[in-house]
A protein has these predicted regions:
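N-terminal glycine-rich FAD/FM-binding segment characteristic of electron-transfer flavoproteins
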Residues: 1-226
Length: 226
């Protein structure tokens, strides 16, 4: 049984928190507003969140950035951190180990910072709307990102997709991935790639790589081709 659930939204514009104000089961919504969230400095994110968030167990969605922030936040608060959780039963948290070949269950006594993998829990519906509290926070920014280069794509990220169609080196050439993209567009899937395909063809970006050295996925349907 859970206690009061507070949703904390890190943002540069407090209106970004309005979309979660009516989530079912939410007791309170806090928009933590800071310019630090416009950048990618995990230390700054953790500093700003720590200054504004109430005490208690904190849940993050498990992404590369949020897991970094989660670790730093836990260190600042002197509490446990558990990453990539796929099941929660009271104080017992289960997460995969050895590249998904086994699961471990740890028991947490007291508060913790927990990152939860995407698509392992059902989404919540809408309930009564909550007021959004706005907290201005400052972060201790130690690094500055000069440039972010991102591959332009309107496609789903493989780590968040319910359906993935993934190609390997047997596709023959990166041009043949267009066939996978056509299928993906039809069924609403993300397009992934094996490590061999990513290593062989520079046209296939690492952001598409699925597996131990790529992205961890949890789809309802996975189609491997080539």
């Amino acid at each position: 049984e859970t206690g009061d659930v507070t949703v904390v939204v890190p943002c540069t514009d407090a209106s970004m928190a309005d979309s979660v104000a009516s989530y079912d089961g939410v007791s309170k919504v806090i928009a933590v507003k800071s310019d630090v969230f416009a950048g990618n400095d995990s230390s700054g994110w953790a500093s700003a969140l720590d200054s504004a968030m109430p005490a208690g167990t904190v849940l993050f969605l498990a992404t590369a950035r949020s897991k970094d922030v989660a670790s730093r936040l836990a260190a600042r608060r002197g509490i446990s951190v558990v990453q990539d959780v796929v099941s929660i039963d009271g104080n017992n948290l289960t997460s995969p180990i050895y590249s998904g070949k086994a699961n471990q269950t740890v028991t947490v006594n007291g508060e913790a910072v927990v990152s939860v993998r995407a698509n392992v829990f059902s989404s919540v519906g809408s309930g009564s709307s909550n007021d959004v509290s706005v907290v201005d926070a400052s972060g201790d920014v130690k690094t500055a990102v000069q440039q972010v280069m991102e591959r332009a794509s309107a496609r789903l990220d493989v780590s968040e997709a319910n359906i993935i169609i993934s190609g390997g080196r047997g596709m023959g050439s990166p041009a043949n991935f267009s066939h996978l993209e056509a299928v993906a567009d039809t069924i609403g899937a993300a397009v992934g790639a094996s490590r061999a395909a990513v290593d062989t063809w520079e046209e296939i970006p690492h952001s598409m790589q699925v597996g131990q050295t790529g992205k961890t996925v949890n789809p309802n349907l996975y189609i491997a081709v080539g």
